[in-house]
Amino acid sequence: TIEGSYEGQPPNIIDVVVRDRRWAQGNLQHLAIVGQAGLTPMGRVHLGMGAASYLISGIWALSLVVGMVLALQGGQFIPSYFEDSKTLFPIWPIIDPGAALRLFMATLAVVFLPKLLGLLLELKRARAERSVKHALRSTIGVAYETVFSMLIAPILMITQTVGAIQIFAGLDSGWKAQKRDDGALSFYDAMKFARLHTLIGALVAAIAWKVSPGLLVWMAPVVAGLLLAGPVSWLTARPAGAFSRWSLATR
């Protein structure tokens, strides 16, 4: 093999982003051949899913932008419940809170159901082993992973969106040897890496607050992940230490 070309687990989130950018370029390049003759249907699905996995972040970011623009427009919109023609019957806006609730619950199911099923499986094993410690570690581990993944998701949303734009603009990521052993990351370097995330987080928070404090609460998971991108990135390079003994149900 080419020296240093093999892939391994990156030691911190900055190196994850570097690897992710390289993988994104490879997967998005497949869009050029996914429609070519000679591929099986499953092969097309496989290539399409690989490319889509790096486009989803951009779609998520775009949906947030569109949602905030609509919220800003809604705050300045003066409703009119009557047409220009004279009528005694108002035209009420169509609002379907039931559909919104169903969509919200479906989203929660997609995000949390796999975690819940995994936790239930571990609790079942803990009960069979009569191990309170196993059950406690499993529960703490799921809670820790849920919070940490919530904070990391907005970070990757920004980096993957920027990466996709760079790829479509023709910018090559190259293939440098991956850092595997030394995961050290200074707090300064972490904050420098996260400066764009922090700026976007502050801007989103300010706009959301201007529209409605309720909107800021609704967007709190995204805003928190962006504003805390620096400290969270720094934490990914720190050793887990004693915490790993109480947060991971490993065997």
Q: What kind of region is each of these model predictions?
A:
Residues 109-125, 160-167, 206-213:
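Transmembrane alpha-helical segments in integral membrane proteins
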